[in-house]
């Protein structure tokens, strides 16, 4: 999947982030360029991000052949907020992530590998619970181990496999 991430704010946002009108103009440009997968936001990053997603949903601006993606951390209240933002958006890609690298595990979270893996599993459980709560069966799940390059390869694989197991896609 070639997914444009030009619309998403977060820690790599522009010094002066785009406002809703600018995001709308950029979204329409990406459609005109032929993108079929577009990351439209990180709803917990700002109210502008949330409002932009709601605008796209309420005005039904997403063509039926386009999949939009949203990003959220594996945290219950943030996943719930993301579901509020995507209400009315068909077939969204929900991209969840959590930090898995050694530095963040030790310094930020003071957590073991097992505890970090559980954050990812709990993220998937929350997505599934929100799917029931919001009456959604069309969510496409994407998971990323944040800061993958600083994560031991065996652990990154272990976490991704645990996510697949919880989602019900074990190979």
Give residue ranges: language-model regions.
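Alpha/beta enzyme core
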Residues: 2, 9-37, 53-63, 76-171
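Conserved short loop/turn motifs at secondary-structure junctions
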Residues: 40-45, 71, 144-149
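A glycine-rich helix N-cap at a beta->alpha junction
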Residues: 62-72
């Amino acid at each position: 999947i070639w997914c444009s991430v030009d619309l998403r704010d977060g820690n790599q946002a522009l010094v002066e982030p785009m406002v809703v009108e600018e995001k709308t103009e950029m979204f329409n440009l990406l459609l005109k360029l032929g993108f079929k997968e577009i990351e439209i936001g990180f709803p917990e990053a700002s109210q502008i991000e949330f409002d932009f997603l709601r605008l796209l949903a309420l005005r039904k601006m997403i063509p039926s052949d386009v999949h939009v993606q949203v990003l959220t951390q594996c945290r219950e209240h943030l996943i719930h907020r993301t579901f509020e933002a995507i209400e009315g958006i068909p077939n969204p890609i929900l991209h969840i992530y959590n930090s898995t690298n050694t530095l963040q595990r030790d310094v930020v979270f003071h957590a073991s590998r097992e505890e970090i893996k559980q954050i990812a599993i709990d993220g998937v459980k929350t997505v599934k619970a929100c799917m029931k709560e919001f009456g959604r069966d069309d969510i496409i799940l994407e998971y990323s181990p944040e800061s993958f390059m600083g994560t031991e390869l065996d652990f990154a694989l272990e976490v991704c496999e645990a996510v697949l197991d919880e989602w019900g896609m074990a190979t």
